[in-house]
Amino acid sequence: TIRDYLHDYKGEEIFVREIRDKEGKVQDAKKRASDFGKTKEEVSKNVLENCIDVRLFGGTIPLNKDSVTFTGPVQFNLGRSLHKVDLKRIKGTGAFASGEGKANKTFREEYILSYSLVGFYGIINENAAKITNLTQGDINLLIEGMWNGTKNLISRSKVGQLPRLLIKVNYKEENYHIGGLLKKISLNKNVDDEAIRSPKNYTVN
């Protein structure tokens, strides 16, 4: 989400992205690393200078006989719904045959949610940020990408998702964060959890 937004809408260089050659083959990680130099020192320096996703999220860059690993200053927790959800299982047929020369199509099965208000939180570690040379400009683009990137999701499972609230906390004390922020959020609902379909059905407390 964030990587796609920063690359497609802000023109930022992204290390972890799909690149195809003239024959349509996907570039592997070692070939991608070679775009930034020949030696370990060259690759490390040039990747950090040019690739905002590595400065933000870190990454492991494989080389021919070695690798470079950067721990990402930005870490997110796994999102979870802030209320009970109406989970439905649907079945359908796929677009392809079940095997070569067969007439029957494959079957697919998936789970969908009628609605869910999903909460995430993350941290930016100032010590790791010094190692990846993360800048305030990078952080500003991260925040922009979190908000606008969500609105630009177009995959089948994510289309229609909208951001509802974004709060950034700046700590005065170094090497400190509150943690467990989702436990400090609750919903005041005017319907049962499973009946929630829009922000009209709740307020955030």
Explain the meaning of each model-derived region:
Residues 1-205:
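RNA-binding basic/glycine-rich loop and surface signature characteristic of RAMP-family CRISPR effectors
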